[in-house]
């Protein structure tokens, strides 16, 4: 589980999780970069993130399970690199914290044992990258 206080209210953080263009800036732990993000944010809607991880191409796919705006987001998560294939579940909880801040909690369940540590570290880096984007007011960098 990863927790991070972000410099924006829950509604603004929620929007980041549903905006493919903005998500391209923070979703993958650097140096990996998303090459394409497709989101259909509704229960049963699909998500897909194609990634270039220093020359290795992989895809994250899943389905939205729950969207409780702006509090809770749940979706399945499967990586094309996982052998054997597996489905895990990501739960993102957004709680008001202080003045115009959000406590974001990311819980990633049902992960294959061999990727537990890398995903824990990856979500921590993603939290840092999202914080940096929100600190800039959501402005894209190149």
Feature annotation, model-predicted:
Residues 1-33:
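Hydrophobic ligand-binding cavity/cleft-lining segments
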Residues 4, 106-108:
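Short, hydrophobic/aromatic-enriched beta-strand segments in well-ordered soluble domains
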Residues 24, 28-29, 38, 42, ...:
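Hydrophobic-ligand binding "helix-grip"
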Residues 13, 23, 47, 64, ...:
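Hydrophobic pocket/interface hotspot
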Residues 81, 110-142:
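A conserved amphipathic terminal alpha-helix motif
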């Amino acid at each position: 589980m990863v927790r991070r206080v972000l410099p924006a209210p829950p509604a603004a953080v929620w929007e980041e999780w549903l905006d493919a263009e903005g998500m391209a800036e923070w979703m993958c732990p650097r140096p990996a970069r998303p090459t394409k993000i497709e989101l259909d944010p509704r229960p049963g809607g699909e998500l897909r993130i194609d990634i270039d991880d220093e020359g290795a191409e992989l895809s994250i796919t899943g389905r939205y399970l729950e969207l409780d705006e702006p509090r809770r987001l749940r979706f399945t998560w499967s990586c094309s690199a996982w052998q054997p294939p597996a489905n895990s579940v990501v739960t993102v909880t957004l709680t008001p914290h202080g003045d115009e801040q959000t406590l974001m909690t990311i819980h990633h369940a049902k992960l294959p044992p061999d990727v537990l540590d890398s995903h824990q570290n990856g979500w921590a880096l993603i939290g840092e990258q999202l914080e940096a984007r929100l600190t800039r007011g959501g402005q894209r960098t190149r």
